Amino acid sequence: MVREEVAGSTQTLQWKCVESRVDSKRLYYGRFILSPLRKGQADTVGIALRRALLGEIEGTCITRAKFWSVPHEYSTIAGIEESVQEILLNLKEIVLRSNLYGVRDASICVKGPKYITAQDIILPPSVEIVDTAQPIANLTEPIDFCIDLQIKRDRGYQTELIKNYQDGSYPIDAVSMPVRNVNYSIFSCGNGNEKHEILFLEIWTNGSLTPKEALYEASRNLIDLFLPFLHAEEEGTSFEENKNRFTPPLFTFQKRLTNLKKNKKGIPLNCIFIDQLELTSRTXNCLKRANIHTLLDLLSKTEEDLLRIDSFRMEDRKHIWDTLEKHLPIDLLKNKLSF
C-alpha cells in the first residue's frame, strides 16, 4: 500500500476503470479508482476488497486425476517424458472458466507420439479452457494414454492429506483462486478540513474472469456479509428476535415431499430446475454449490441441511418459500405444504 499527496477536488463518491489490458491469455490487468473518500475510509475499503478478491472469488480447476496401472505418483510411464508427479503439476496449472457447481468429469485419451496440451482435455459443455496451449505431457512413443479427471468449482486453496489411492486416483491440491494479485494505493487531495482520499485498486486475474468481474463479485460478497446488520437496523430487532422470528421451519421437508409425490397434480419435481424458480442469483448459487439443482433436490433437504450450506442465510429460507408459493399451485401449497 502506497500513500501519496496529489491535487484533487471533492465530488460525489464514484468509481471507474482507468486502465484495462490483457497481457496474455492467463494474465489480465485492471486498475480502478474510487473517490472521494474521507480520511481512513480508503484503507477500510482497500483492505476489505483485497481480502475478498484474494479469498472469496470462486474458481474452477482440476481436483483429481486417475491413471491406469500406475503404482504411485512418482512413477514413470514408458513412452512419456514426464513422471506422474510432473503431469499432476501440469494439470494443476490448467486454467478453466465455468459457472458449474458440484463435481464434473473430464478425460484425456490420446495416442502417441504426441505433445499433449490442455486442448486435448475432453470437457463437459459447461467448462471452457482459457489457454489451450498449456502443456500436460509429451508422448514420445506410439502408446495409448488415458486419464480420467474430476473438475470442481470452489474457492481458496484445497489440499488433501492422502496423496494416492490403490485405484490409481490422485488428488490434486487445487488452487481455486482466479485473482492472482491485488494492490491498492491511497492518494490524499485537498487542503485543511477539505482533505479527501482517492483509492486506486489494481487487480491481476488468471484469465478465467476479468478484473472488473472479480471486483463485482468481491463487492457482492462483502455486501452480503453486511446485509443482516442492515436488516436488523431497519426492522428495529435484535439478533435474538431475528433468530426467534425464523424459528418455525418453512418446510416440513420429508413429510411435505411425500405429500407432493402423492398429489393429484402429478408435478414432476425432478424436472423443475431451481433456475426456473426466479430465485436471486445469490440464493441459487448457494443451492447449486450444495448440488441442489431441482425442486426434488430442494425438498429432499432438511432445514439443518440448508443452514449448513456455505453462505446460506435464514433470510434465504423465507425467500425460497415465497418463491415456491408463487410458482406452485396455491391449493397444493395450502393442502400439502401448510405449516
Swiss-Prot record:
Its EC number is 2.7.7.6. It is found in: Plastid, Chloroplast. InterPro entries: DNA-dir_RNA_pol_insert, DNA-dir_RNA_pol_RpoA/D/Rpb3, DNA-dir_RpoA, RBP11-like, RNAP_asu_C, RNApol_insert_sf. One of its GO terms (molecular function) is protein dimerization activity. Residues 1-233 are annotated as: Alpha N-terminal domain (alpha-NTD). GO terms for biological process: DNA-templated transcription. It is an enzyme of class 2 (transferase). GO terms for cellular component: chloroplast; DNA-directed RNA polymerase complex; mitochondrion. The keyword Heme does not apply. It catalyses: RNA(n) + a ribonucleoside 5'-triphosphate = RNA(n+1) + diphosphate. Signal peptide: none annotated. SUPFAM superfamilies: C-terminal domain of RNA polymerase alpha subunit, Insert subdomain of RNA polymerase alpha subunit, RBP11-like subunits of RNA polymerase. Pfam families: RNA_pol_A_bac (PF01000), RNA_pol_A_CTD (PF03118), RNA_pol_L (PF01193). SMART domains: RPOLD (SM00662). Keywords: Chloroplast, DNA-directed RNA polymerase, Nucleotidyltransferase, Plastid, Transcription, Transferase. Residues 264-339 are annotated as: Alpha C-terminal domain (alpha-CTD). The keyword Hydrolase does not apply. Belongs to the RNA polymerase alpha chain family. In plastids the minimal PEP RNA polymerase catalytic core is composed of four subunits: alpha, beta, beta', and beta''. When a (nuclear-encoded) sigma factor is associated with the core the holoenzyme is formed, which can initiate transcription. HAMAP family: RNApol_bact_RpoA (MF_00059). DNA-dependent RNA polymerase catalyzes the transcription of DNA into RNA using the four ribonucleoside triphosphates as substrates. The N-terminal domain is essential for RNAP assembly and basal transcription, whereas the C-terminal domain is involved in interaction with transcriptional regulators and with upstream promoter elements. This is DNA-directed RNA polymerase subunit alpha.
